[in-house]
C-alpha cells in the first residue's frame, strides 16, 4: 500500500515540476492589474485548465520506507518512527543518541 502512495506522490512531484513555470506565469499575469480584465480572465481560465495534480499544494512529503504522510523529517525523508529505529540500530551515519 505504501508503494502505491509513494508512486502517486512521485507522479505529482513530476507534474508539479513540469508545469511550475507555466503556473507561475499565469498566476503573475492574473494578479497584474495593468493588463485588461478580459486578458486576465483568459489567463485565469488557462490556469484552471492545468492538471490539478500539477499544483505544489497537492505534493505531500512521505516516508520513503513506509509511505507515512505525517511527521516526516525532510532531511532524511523518513518518518520519526523509522528514524528512531534506524538511529538505534546504527545505519544512519553521524546520528547517535544524545546525552548531557
Curated annotation (Swiss-Prot):
Q: Which UniProt keywords apply?
A: Mitochondrion, Ribonucleoprotein, Ribosomal protein
Q: Which GO molecular function terms does the record list?
A: structural constituent of ribosome
Where's it found, cell-wise?
Mitochondrion
BP terms from Gene Ontology = translation
Q: Entry's InterPro entries?
A: Ribosomal_uS14, Ribosomal_uS14_CS
Read off the Pfam families from this record. Answer: Ribosomal_S14 (PF00253)
**What SUPFAM superfamilies does the database record attribute to this sequence?**
Glucocorticoid receptor-like (DNA-binding domain)
An example of a Gene Ontology cellular component annotation for this protein is:
mitochondrion
The record's annotation in PANTHER family points to: 30S RIBOSOMAL PROTEIN S14 (PTHR19836), RIBOSOMAL PROTEIN S14 (PTHR19836:SF30)
| NCBIfam families on file | PRK08881.1
What family is this? Belongs to the universal ribosomal protein uS14 family.
The protein's name is Small ribosomal subunit protein uS14m
